[in-house]
Swiss-Prot record:
Keywords: Lipoyl. The glycine cleavage system catalyzes the degradation of glycine. The H protein shuttles the methylamine group of glycine from the P protein to the T protein. InterPro entries: 2-oxoA_DH_lipoyl-BS, Biotin_lipoyl, GCV_H, GCV_H/Fam206, GCV_H_sub, Single_hybrid_motif. PROSITE patterns: BIOTINYL_LIPOYL, LIPOYL. Its cofactor is (R)-lipoate. SUPFAM superfamilies: Single hybrid motif. Pfam families: GCV_H (PF01597). This is Glycine cleavage system H protein. Disulfide bonds: none annotated. Residues 24-106 form the Lipoyl-binding domain.
Length: 126
């Protein structure tokens, strides 16, 4: 059974989101997604300053099994990326909700965060 922390929000395409104190949102892939992918060997992240819209392809995660696109769950500006993933992408496998975060976005509309899936709603999608 995949770990689905209750304090996070989710989208059906298997990304998790955490609202930070400064109003930005940290995004990564879920435990379910990393389990399905297997050992992650490469991550392509967006550039800081990129503007993304909901459902835009924003990153790529490659594993020994497949390459998988990561889609933007919110519209906004990318304000930070997890550069550590470039040298150590497998941290997504070992700590998907912590050190394995992928990027941080400043959403255009803060209310959009509240409309995302709760942990219970996401688990029902699995």
């Amino acid at each position: 059974m995949s770990n689905v922390p209750s304090e996070l929000k989710y989208v059906a395409s298997h990304e998790w989101l955490r609202l930070e104190d400064d109003g930005t949102v940290t995004v990564g892939i879920t435990d379910h997604a990393q389990e399905a992918l297997g050992d992650i060997v490469y991550v392509e992240l967006p550039d800081v300053g990129d503007t993304v819209a909901v459902d835009d392809e924003v990153a790529v995660v490659e594993s020994v099994k497949a390459a998988s696109d990561v889609y933007a769950p919110l519209t906004g500006e990318v304000v930070a990326i997890n550069e550590a993933l470039e040298d150590d992408p497998e941290v997504i496998n070992t700590d998907p909700y912590g050190e394995g975060w992928m990027y941080r976005i400043k959403p255009d509309n803060a209310d959009d965060f509240e409309s995302l899936l709760s942990a219970e709603e996401y688990q029902a999608e699995l």
